[in-house]
Structure formats: structure tokens, C-alpha cells
């Protein structure tokens, strides 16, 4: 698995961001049964930048904690068999499945960790697990989908032994 990691801005999280991100992405992909080596882009930024991205790409005029930009349109969440005939979903040089981009606000990680009464590490890991589910076709437009996604997030966090 390849993680392309970039960090911008002055806010720092009190943890090893790149190493933890790689661990969470690998665990989440294993959990959903991704049979391919994959690549993910992760950008850690601040509220002003994620606000602009949220406004531009989603039409929502406020900062958010995490944005996910999947590169693949899945017919069903967490299904990968259709990809064998989708050469454009794989990096031509590495052969890895190109899942997409994750953007996280470091300020939101710190604020939400405090608000929810857990560590910044737990909040950061949760947001990455949440986003990887989006990158593999999961969403929560309907209540049933939300329940499925929440259960999967909990199980990934339990497998990582990163609890509240």
C-alpha cells in the first residue's frame, strides 16, 4: 500500500501522523477485503483550506473535518470484483489500485477530540477509517447505510485497538 502524505499549515498534531495513517488505511482495506495493493493520497490541512475545498466541491460554505474524493464508482460498497476489467482504476506504473484522496483538517481533529473526550490520535484514526470507507464505496445517504458505515467504523477501530 502506498500512502502519499502531505501536510500544510502551522497547526501540528501531537502524533506520528504519517505512520498512523498508513496503519489505519492498511487495516481498513484489509477489513473491507480489498484484494489489491492500493494507493491513497492524504492531505492534512487547516480549517481555512478545507473550508474552501468544501465550498468548491460540495457547495457547503463552512469548514469540515474530513473530505473524501473517491476515484472509483462502485456498483456496491466494498465490492472489488468488477475492477478486473477496469484498467483505468490502476496506476500504470505501480499497478496499485488508485482509491482517491483524503483531506483532513488538523484543527477539527483537535477540537473534536476535545469535544468528544478522547485523544487526537483516536479522532485522527477515526476520520481516516471513515474516509477509507468512502473511498471503497460506502456512504450514508440513507439511515440504513449510515448504520452499516458506523458499525464498520467501530469494528475497524476495535481491530486497531484505538478505542474511546
Kindly give the residue locations of the regions a language model identified:
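An acidic/histidine-cluster motif and surrounding catalytic segment
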Residues: 1-125, 135-164
